[in-house]
């Protein structure tokens, strides 16, 4: 909900919804949504929410601008205090805007319009599957996250064991608990002990994104090496989207993307020793040439 001046006390300033974790399970998300849903008996206009799709057909940058303009209008004119960014409208014709770009771009536009204190941002995304991904969204302005794909993966993985309803609920809570622990570990390395203090801190080093994207979405974050532009990212999205929908009902090997630990003699990883050493050497030489990071 809205954040007011802490030096000016009024009863209505206490009207805030509190969650015990930034990672929402479905039940908690449904409760949160019900407070701002005009069709719900729980509805209170102070918690008015609106869902915005974060999918697009073409032109990533223009789609981000359009999304931000809709959000700003809803907050400024319609009194929306909870903005929900949802990528579940993904389909064969609709591609998903990367969650970090959507959250970061909307967050920065709200800041520039002087409206950020009036709204909380909730992300419904399939991209968050580990503590780092969650920390990125929180660090760039997200208040809470409903990682539906992560919980769906937990259900699918353990379904073969035919757990009871109680056991499945416990497994889902353990999944949430593990991500919470990871977020706490990330925050503690920066000497931060509360999510409220970590939110919108931008305490990340950015490698491989153009200055335009950093300025638009991740203002204030430290960027070592420039790289991908909006058009480059859109090309990657198009490729992934094509691979996902190229043939209906077909199953393909899971592409892990090279984010996990390098093992000598094991599978190739994007972030292996050769790549990281090249980045370190390039930074030490104070030279930047995008061609060194292509391919």
Q: Could you describe each region identified by the protein language model?
A:
Residues 50-68, 120-130:
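Active-site mouth loops of central-metabolism enzymes
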Residues 58, 69-82, 88, 108-115:
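Conserved helix-loop functional segments at active or binding sites
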Residues 87, 106, 137, 194:
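Conserved, mostly hydrophobic/aromatic
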Residues 88-90, 126, 142, 149-152:
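Short, ordered loop/turn segments at secondary-structure junctions
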Residues 92-105, 153-161:
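Active-site-adjacent beta->alpha loops and helix N-cap segments on the catalytic face
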Residues 127-141:
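Catalytic cores of alpha/beta
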